[in-house]
Amino acid sequence: MNTINEITATYQRIAEEGRSELNKVQNKIYRIGSLRLLLFVAGIAGIIYFWSSGWIVLTGIIAVTLLPFILLIKYHNRLFHRKDYLEKKIAINEQELSALNYDTSSFEDGAEFIDPAHLYSYDLDVFGPHSLFQYINRTCTQLGKSLLANWLGTHLVNKKEIESRQEAIRELTSELNFRQEFRILGLLYKGKAADEDELKAWAKSPSAFRKNVFFRMLPLLAGGINILCIALAIAGIIPLTVFGILWLCFVFASFCFTSKITKMQAVYGKKLQILATYANLLRLIENQPMKSPILKEVREWIGDEKQTASHSIQRLSKLMNELDQRNNAYIYATLNGLFFWEIRKIIQIEGWKEQYASELPRWLTAIAHMDVLCSLATFAYNHPDYSYPIITTRSFSLRAASMGHPLMNRDKCVRNDIDIEKRPFFIIITGANMAGKSTYLRTVGINYLLACIGTPVCARSMELYPAQLITSLRTSDSLNDNESYFFAELKRLKLIIDKLQAGEEFFIILDEILKGTNSMDKQKGSLALIKQFMTLQANGIIATHDLMLGTLADIYPDDIHNYRFEADITGNELTFSYRLREGVAQNMNACFLMKKMGIAVTD
């Protein structure tokens, strides 16, 4: 197992190798650019100077200047592509170095997925700035980004599914080169959020040209007539001008379809770059050996060796690129006059669509799954000190040793344990302000979520039964719905009760129940709620300032345990250990802090 220092050294080495090669490529680009300019100037000057020397001399000048100039264009373009590739390679390794120091600002934060009504994601800061999503997200496609959000928002609750995903993540964790290659190729052209829907909609759209017999026959008819005219002209039966007149007629006839084809080309043209990206990603998946069942399944989604998905998509990309040649007026006139070339290309594209439309969604799904699994594997690779949880079938169980919050600096994070071994069972945590209650709840929630999506967790060890996670930590007012803070929380608690009564299994995390009412009412309601949880065989953690809730452990000695986070007052100073201790809190700090700030407090 690598250490953090070894992982840091690996990223530094790859970035440095990239910078070294990039410097060489940039020098080549400069030299080739200079050579192209020299050849172009020499060619033009030679043609002008030797214009009257005959076609043999001019042909020789073109052969030694302009032809090499054209050949160098292709090589120059390859160098620019390599430059883009190396810049992405350097960037992603520099980003990982920053991420190891908890700077994830360069990654997308998934703020568009924030949902205050979600069962747990809003409370646990799963999406948004400085979120779990931003910390994990290494997706290089919009497909993968959306799927990662989906996985974080709808975690697994099946033991076999979680263990299968763990196996896939373990396998990819050791494949650093594959993961980085996948990410680089995806980032070269990431596309936009609507690409997937637009491609699927196009795949389902009708084939207007291919379904029409007239359009299918037109290229064959025009081509046959032109060949016949050329043959007759060569035989001296008809003058060549007949062929020329027919050719012009076909060119003008093609104008009748120009508007419709231009609209179709505009749609296709937007997909060229993203299709090329998808083809590259699919080819990478096809060539990667897979061992775990999930990765083998992803591989099966993209076809067999005889007709691979990458080859099929590359063929479509080639057809669309050929259609783009109609923008060249000379090619447009020449080929359309010969055999209605653009109609032929549209028919070929529609033929591809009819052949592979049913396969396209599976191919896109394969890309998305591999993208997300690579993200999760990078998370595992960057945290060699994390452990994969043991998934149990014993309901309910949640045991973890030395558990910390993954977004907190590893050198400053105070780690604590948790131990729930039966159903029903609740942990009630009391403590002063700022003592660590809320952080502990989020630590438990985030690690529980990580375990249920198949990744390692920030703990020395963990064992859990995967029930549905639900929280109520930061209920807020809703001005749009005319809802008070208190009523919003009641709706949340009602949701939990209804689902428990329906027989659903939950792991519940609550912070300060019934915050929006007076102390006596709050206490009475909180006691009643927890008693109902016991009746419904529920499990969870509740943090509170209300020490009276600690008396519930006397009523349910086997089902409720008290823990606390203390604020220690020594002399005139307030200190926090952030260590979870057994029992009910002894010290509260509100009055102490008010006095420290000069606010009068009557003893």
Where are these regions (language model features)?
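ATPase nucleotide-binding head domains, primarily ABC-like/P-loop NTPase cores
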Residues: 376, 382-603
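Alpha-helical coupling/stalk and coiled-coil linker elements that connect catalytic or binding modules
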Residues: 1-432, 439-469, 491-492
